[in-house]
Amino acid sequence: VILLMSTQALIQSGVEKRSNKIKALSKRKTTAESWWEGECYGWWTSCSSPEQCCSLNCENIYCRAW
């Protein structure tokens, strides 16, 4: 009985962790959503760091497509 309960608890823990990972990933926005909401710059916009660009590519002070 104890082994069965331990196994069930272990399985339940794994299911909960997987569920939390799925929820976290589903909350991530697409590049288009981030751009539309003004969270990052589109191509050919002036930038000072890669994190500002939706493409994460800031080259020669401009966001590049890739």
UniProtKB/Swiss-Prot annotation:
Organism field: Conus tessulatus (Tessellate cone)
Propeptide residue range(s): 10-38
InterPro entries per UniProt: Conotoxin (IPR004214)
Protein name (record): Conotoxin TsMEKL-03
Entry's Gene Ontology molecular function annotations: ion channel inhibitor activity; toxin activity
Signal peptide range: 1-9
Top-level taxon of the source organism: Eukaryota
Family: Belongs to the conotoxin O2 superfamily.
Keywords: Disulfide bond, Knottin, Neurotoxin, Secreted, Signal, Toxin
Major localisation: secreted
Record comment regarding domains: The presence of a 'disulfide through disulfide knot' structurally defines this protein as a knottin.
Subcellular location: Secreted
Bridged cysteine pairs (disulfide): 40-54, 47-58, 53-63
Tissues with expression: Expressed by the venom duct.
GO cellular component entries: extracellular region
